[in-house]
Regions:
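Seventh transmembrane helix
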Residues: 243-253, 266-312
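Extracellular N-terminal segment of 7TM GPCRs
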Residues: 1-30, 34-37, 331
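Helix-to-loop junction signature of class
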Residues: 17-21, 34, 60-79, 100-106, ...
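Loop architecture of class A 7-transmembrane GPCRs
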Residues: 2-3, 76-93, 97, 146-191
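Intracellular effector-coupling site of seven-transmembrane GPCRs
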Residues: 48-57, 205-248
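Fourth transmembrane helix
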Residues: 71, 102-109, 116, 122-165, ...
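Extracellular TM2-ECL1-early TM3 structural module of rhodopsin-like
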Residues: 9-18, 46-109, 117
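Intrinsically disordered regulatory tails of 7TM GPCRs
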Residues: 1, 37, 212-231, 291-331
Length: 331
């Protein structure tokens, strides 16, 4: 069946879309509230600016895309059939492309921010500030908008995918311009994701080096704890994003290098995975928030501390007994 111009949804239930919409909205709102509470307790930083932008972008994705799918199911029409000239399909495809690019770009900037804060602290303190974060986010949004309007100018195309409730860039474009455009999209995702992974690995290695050569146990431990609190959610979200975007990148390269035979099922799975990251991101921040990490850290270390205390008590008792016996022998 050709889903490109289908106007009525053949079958399906909106339960999955409704659950995804609810989880995305609730998760992002909860994460933003927790982030705001923490911001009021501590001085805001560049990292908080970037995290807020990431969560706001994910929330924007949930409220701008999911209601369109629910409306399509309610009307029994596909995205192409909901408007005369497929404007709804173009709107959906624009949002999917914009949100995937902007989210990944923000994640990459967050990874670079962590690397500079640990690897080059003097440069970080001297040249980077919250203002740099606001400017960077604005530039990311601007660049993504410019890229996403290219299909309206003849470079690439937003098309409908199975079962008629998804629209995205044409991953099997026959024209050279369309192939170059979608190839650039996939290559950009691959390069930025690789940069993010390299930065996170570099931060991890730097933290290990800091731990090994620390001079003051108290100050080094506190500094490392703060960095781990930032690194752990970022690394987890990076893994989630790789799992969600890599199948789409592979689908694009397969379509570019292989035949142009339509594989709707594989394309649909890749698109669904792409939409999951905006739902999972806020829950990662909620589960791995610093307060919960500190509680888990204390729970894990409490048995060790108890064992050490018992060992010290036993040694003290043995020493006192030995001293007492020695004094009696002397007398």
């Amino acid at each position: 069946m050709d889903f490109l111009f289908l106007t009525f949804i053949p079958s399906g239930q909106p339960i999955t879309s409704a659950v995804m919409f609810s989880a995305g909205v609730v998760g992002n709102i909860m994460a933003l509230v927790l982030l705001e509470v923490r911001r009021r307790r501590t001085s805001p930083s560049l990292y908080h600016v970037l995290v807020t932008a990431l969560l706001m972008t994910d929330l924007l994705g949930s409220v701008s895309v999911s209601p369109v799918v629910l409306s399509a199911y309610a009307q029994g029409k596909t995205l192409v059939g909901m408007s005369a000239n497929a404007e709804v399909c173009s709107y959906f495809g624009f949002n999917m492309t914009f949100l995937s690019l902007s989210t990944l770009a923000i994640l990459c900037v967050m990874a670079l921010e962590r690397y500079l804060s640990i690897g080059h602290p003097y440069f970080y303190e001297r040249h980077l500030s919250k203002r740099c974060g606001y400017i960077t986010i604005a530039l990311i949004y601007l660049a993504c908008v410019i890229f996403c309007i290219a299909p309206f100018l003849g470079f690439g195309e937003y098309v409908q995918y199975c079962p008629g409730t998804w629209c995205f860039l044409d991953m099997s474009h026959a024209e050279v311009k369309g192939q170059v455009y979608i190839g650039f999209y996939a290559s950009f995702i691959l390069i930025v994701t690789s940069t993010t992974v390299v930065c996170n690995i570099a931060v991890l290695l730097l933290l290990v080096m800091m731990y090994r050569r620390r001079v003051s146990a108290h100050s080094a431990s506190r500094s490392m704890t703060e960095e781990v609190e930032h690194l752990l959610p970022l690394a987890t979200i990076t893994v989630v994003f790789i799992c969600c975007t890599l199948p789409l990148v592979l689908r694009v390269y397969v379509n570019l290098t292989g035949s142009h035979e339509e594989r709707h099922a594989a394309d649909l799975r890749a698109l669904r995975l792409l939409s999951f990251h905006s739902i999972l991101n806020p829950w990662v921040f909620i589960i791995l928030r610093p307060s919960l990490l500190k509680i888990l850290w204390r729970k894990l270390h409490k048995p060790q501390e108890s064992t050490l205390m018992r060992g010290k008590t036993l040694n003290s008792a043995q020493n006192s007994t030995g001293c007492h016996l020695q004094s009696n022998t002397t007398i």
